[in-house]
């Protein structure tokens, strides 16, 4: 089963209504589409006018649901919906094994990850970590290295294998590798050279992942139309 499976959600709230003492919002399942997001905005009153004729233009996020350990604690009230959607889509597009790897890395605690930009970059850097399924404690790790990793052979160990303190051996290995144990198995860093493909700029999010307005729409909105009136000529619009 996919890790998210429709369970990455954000409660998008009308900020203007909230400041008036009303909680008007809706749970949004991520990833979603720009069309669906616009429907949500309409339902929660974004774009509509208040009693003074001023439009409700701002929103914020009052709650999250995410099945991946630690993710909710890294997300704030004013996160970009485009970034959130990009993150959810990137996770959904991972293979099932890579999704499980991501879960294990987050459960182990990833020093490189502290915010949504880091989470996005983590999806591009899963090969920087090794996951060893079925190894859940120091004793498992010590036994694996002694018998299965090829460091020692059963023949070489002989009866000495009965006297090995696998737990202590595994503890020393985990300390040397800075590895951690999770429900998914043992997690260790394979490479410290992260490739930061996403620098946090919204312009770097591909249009297909944007849900608050595509790049083309933003470009159209930024165009200024000027009515030019010249003596003896018909007025005309210049962009």
Could you describe each region identified by the protein language model?
Residues 136-183, 190:
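Acidic, low-complexity, intrinsically disordered interaction modules
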Residues 165, 214-239:
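Non-Sec secretion/translocation targeting segments of pathogen effectors
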Residues 35-116:
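Structured domain cores in non-transmembrane regions
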Residues 171-217:
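Long, highly charged low-complexity segments enriched in Glu/Asp and Lys/Arg with interspersed Ser/Thr
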Residues 13-19, 63-66, 190:
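Short, flexible beta-strand-to-coil junctions
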Residues 47, 90-97, 108, 122-129, ...:
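Surface-exposed polar/charged interaction patches
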Residues 103, 109-149:
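Extracytoplasmic/secretory-pathway segments with low complexity and glycosylation-like composition
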Residues 1-50:
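N-terminal ordered "arm"
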């Amino acid at each position: 089963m996919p890790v998210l499976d429709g369970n990455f959600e954000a409660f998008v709230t009308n900020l203007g209504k909230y400041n008036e003492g009303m909680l008007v919002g809706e749970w949004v399942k991520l990833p979603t589409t720009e069309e669906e997001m616009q429907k949500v905005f309409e339902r929660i009153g974004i774009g509509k006018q208040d009693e003074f004729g001023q439009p409700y233009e701002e929103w914020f996020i009052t709650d999250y649901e995410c099945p991946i350990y630690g993710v909710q604690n890294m997300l704030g009230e004013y996160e970009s919906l485009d970034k959130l959607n990009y993150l959810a889509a990137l996770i959904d597009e991972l293979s099932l094994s890579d999704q499980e790897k991501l879960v294990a890395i987050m459960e182990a605690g990833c020093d490189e990850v502290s915010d949504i930009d880091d989470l996005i970059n983590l999806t591009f850097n899963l090969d920087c970590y090794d996951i060893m399924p079925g190894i859940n404690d120091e004793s498992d790790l010590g036994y694996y290295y002694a018998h299965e990793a090829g460091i020692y052979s059963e023949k070489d160990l002989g009866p000495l294998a009965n006297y090995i303190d696998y737990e202590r051996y595994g503890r020393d290995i985990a300390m040397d590798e800075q590895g951690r144990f999770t429900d998914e198995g043992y997690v260790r860093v394979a490479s410290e050279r992260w490739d930061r493909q996403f620098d946090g700029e919204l312009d770097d999010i591909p249009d297909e992942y944007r849900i608050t307005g595509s790049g083309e729409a933003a470009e159209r909105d930024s165009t200024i139309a000027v009515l030019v009136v010249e003596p003896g000529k018909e007025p005309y619009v210049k962009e």
